């Protein structure tokens, strides 16, 4: 495996997308953050598929992939442009499980950071909804 160095300045928030009403991250982004190649990460998932029910991980459809590519310039040329297979996406639960099967220090460190970001986003959304409800009354 090639050694990949991940900067602390990476904006993980920009790697979180909404698909099927769930906040998810792409397999390619997680592979980069965890220091793996995408095919290595997906191979580990498929070997441990019983640990990844659909609310943890799922493969997106052609339509979802096209929509994702169009979403705010997501997946710019050169990054995911010529994928052989449709990407897998992972919810926060799947990301935690993924770190457990990869068992690298970097994967564990990054998964903790990612889950913290998911929680922060949920708290922000909940606070915004409460404020909106308060001001609308």
What does each model-identified segment do?
Residues 1-137:
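Basic, low-complexity intrinsically disordered segments
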């Amino acid at each position: 495996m090639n050694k990949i160095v991940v900067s602390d300045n990476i904006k993980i928030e920009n790697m979180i997308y909404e698909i099927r009403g769930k906040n998810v991250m792409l397999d390619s982004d997680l592979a980069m953050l965890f220091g793996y190649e995408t095919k290595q990460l997906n191979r580990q998932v498929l070997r441990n598929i019983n640990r990844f029910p659909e609310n943890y991980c799922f493969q997106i459809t052609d339509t979802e992939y096209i929509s994702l590519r169009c979403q705010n310039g997501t997946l710019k040329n050169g990054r995911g442009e010529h994928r052989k297979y449709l990407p897998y996406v992972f919810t926060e639960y799947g990301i935690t499980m993924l770190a457990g099967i990869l068992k690298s220090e970097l994967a564990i460190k990054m998964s903790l950071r990612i889950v913290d970001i998911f929680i922060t986003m949920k708290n922000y959304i909940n606070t915004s909804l409460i404020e909106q409800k308060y001001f609308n009354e």
